[in-house]
């Protein structure tokens, strides 16, 4: 039984989406999400290759705006849990209030930047990081040629309605952490100092 429970994150998110859709008088299309997730899972080999370029780093920054910020938190948590890399997530809009001081060639950033309502602002944050010699890996929308010219590496996910991006972005974040941990020869199913259930406060 794996301690780093990726299914719990996706399951909770799916449950919340179904409640939100129901309260809005809409029906959530499970099959649509399943089909998109299958497409994202086909990126596994690509993500493994990208992970091979980052697994030796000891520190990582994750950034995102709006719903992408909680995803950044999940991505950073998974990376630190199973690969033992120090990873911190920040709202992209807060970069200039402190976190940008951490940017360097030795501390890459994973930027969540799909083509959504905050795309241009997040892209501007990425440009600020690149201007300070930071290395950036982005998760972006298929066909986004603009971001390809700015970042060092990119994982593309299918273009969907804005509210569905979290499902497509969570998978690459989790796969990236998995492959980094695997390359570092960490025990992915049983990370050190962690237990499946927390029994003490």
PLM features: what roles do these ranges have?
Residues 1-108, 118, 184-201:
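Active-site phosphate/pyrophosphate-binding segments
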Residues 6-18, 25-34, 108-201:
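Phosphate-moiety recognition in structured ligand-binding domains
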């Amino acid at each position: 039984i794996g301690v780093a429970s990726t299914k719990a994150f996706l399951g909770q998110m799916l449950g919340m989406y179904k409640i939100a859709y129901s309260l809005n008088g809409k029906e959530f299309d499970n099959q649509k999400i399943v089909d998109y997730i299958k497409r994202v899972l086909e990126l596994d080999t690509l993500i493994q290759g990208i992970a091979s370029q980052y697994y030796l780093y000891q520190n990582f920054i994750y950034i995102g705006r709006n719903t992408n910020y909680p995803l950044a938190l999940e991505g950073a948590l998974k990376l630190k849990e199973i690969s033992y890399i120090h990873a911190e997530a920040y709202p992209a809009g807060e970069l200039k209030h402190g976190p940008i001081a951490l940017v360097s060639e030795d501390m890459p950033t994973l930027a969540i930047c799909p083509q959504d309502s905050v795309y241009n602002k997040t892209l501007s944050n990425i440009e600020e990081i690149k201007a300070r010699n930071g290395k950036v890996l982005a998760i972006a929308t298929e066909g986004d040629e603009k971001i390809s010219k700015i970042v060092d590496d990119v994982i593309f996910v299918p273009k969907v309605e804005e509210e569905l991006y979290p499902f497509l972005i969570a998978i690459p974040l989790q796969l990236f952490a998995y492959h980094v941990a695997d390359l570092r020869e960490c025990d992915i199913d049983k990370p050190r100092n962690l237990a499946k259930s927390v029994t003490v406060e």
